[in-house]
Amino acid sequence: MFYVVRSGCAWRLLPSDFGPWQTVYGCFRRWSQDWTWTFIHDTLRDYVRKTEERKVAPTAAIIDSQSVKVPDQAGERGYDAGKKVSGRKRHLAVDCLGLILAIMITPAAVQDRDAAKGLIKVLVSLYGRLQVIWADGGYLGALVQWVKQLRPFGKLRLEIVRRCDQTKGFKVLPKRWIVERTFGWLYKSRRLRSDYEVRLDHSEAMIRICMIRLMLKRLAKAS
């Protein structure tokens, strides 16, 4: 699995040393459907947080999206007019270490604010200690008030990290750089430079496999 994600090779081109490609793909598909990849990913994330002397349940998250191209043979897609990309969007929520808390894959035409509601609902259901979510200006508007209503008697807020209108070129923004770094980690895996998967759940699984590999390397260095 790591070889496919890191090298970007097609399943049928998997070296014979790894066994029949049908067997490997069958395992990947089965683990995608029964949430095994999610379980492994989340377990490793908890271990990494502990090694960094963090509590398992985060109190803060950062959300953002990334539009990626989809080859002609792949499935569902849309057109992101802002980025001028025909493909899909990866919506991520990460903790302050850049580790993924939640993933959502949509056609690229879906607005960030619309997808964010589903992503934030997942965060709220999984992480009861969550207090603040940081996002960029693309999430500004009614979403801020909507987040407050999710926990009317609790402390949960959406904070928009604004970019100065007078700033030209690239500038590192507080908090937002964390999720951008996570997207950079994903880009190092050739399989994730575009979205080659027909099924959306397979797209999510590929992202989790990439992060599993990175977290295993991180834990190995810490041991």
Segment roles from a protein language model:
Residues 1-223:
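Short alpha-helical elements
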